[in-house]
Amino acid sequence: MASSTALSLSWSSSPCWSHSFNGGANETLKVSERRFNFEVVSQKKAKKLRKVILKEDVTDLGKQGQLLDVKAGFFRNFLLPTGKAQLMTPLLLKELKMEDERIEAEKQRVKEEAQQLAMVFQTVGAFKVKRKGGKGKLIFGSVTAQDLVDIIKSQLQKDIDKRLVSLPEIRETGEYIAELKLHPDVTARVKINVFAN
């Protein structure tokens, strides 16, 4: 049924259309019951796109390592001569997938280590901090994130960056809770008991 014969219609010679303009309410439009199958063929030029991977960040285009479809002329005249992109080949695509899998495995390993460290902090209980006492419950100075990091290092032999520690302001004796942001998905809560000497 897929014959590609061209069919041309002339409106004046076609018996299937009948229209009368009498200038009143009796205008009619008659169409015969025959159905025509038309095949429209366009002479539009197809856009030529190239799959490329960016070697560095390109303004208004993408980031390094991103896989994009760009126009062939843009790739040939700008991206290739400046060394900002490389044409995607099956071998390069395979290497890219392997690199993505390696990065994903590394992220998973880091997350698991953070979860294990959070479990260690839950089992330890409270860390004890002694400060010189003042009037009532007040202490001289305050307990800082660096103090907590030093205590964790001395008791658990774990190095924690002090920028990961979120502490309330501690200027009195009592029990406090600090949060350690070990990973974007893992937060550990640590109890701190502050005593006066």
Curated annotation (Swiss-Prot):
GO biological-process terms attached to the record: translation
Record InterPro entries: Ribosomal_bL9, Ribosomal_bL9/RNase_H1_N, Ribosomal_bL9_bac/chp, Ribosomal_bL9_C, Ribosomal_bL9_C_sf, Ribosomal_bL9_N, Ribosomal_bL9_N_sf
Location of the protein in the cell: Plastid, Chloroplast
Entry-linked Pfam families: Ribosomal_L9_C (PF03948), Ribosomal_L9_N (PF01281)
Keyword rRNA-binding: yes
Superkingdom as given in the UniProt entry: Eukaryota
GO MF term list: mRNA binding; rRNA binding; structural constituent of ribosome
Record keywords, A-Z: Chloroplast, Plastid, Ribonucleoprotein, Ribosomal protein, RNA-binding, rRNA-binding, Transit peptide
Classification via SUPFAM superfamilies: L9 N-domain-like, Ribosomal protein L9 C-domain
Boundaries of the annotated transit peptide in chain numbering: 1-42
PROSITE patterns associated with the record: RIBOSOMAL_L9
GO cellular component, as recorded: chloroplast; chloroplast envelope; chloroplast stroma; cytosol; plastid large ribosomal subunit
Primary location group: plastid
Family: Belongs to the bacterial ribosomal protein bL9 family.
Complex formation: Part of the 50S ribosomal subunit.
Free-text function comment from the UniProt entry: Binds to the 23S rRNA.
Protein name per Swiss-Prot or TrEMBL: Large ribosomal subunit protein bL9c
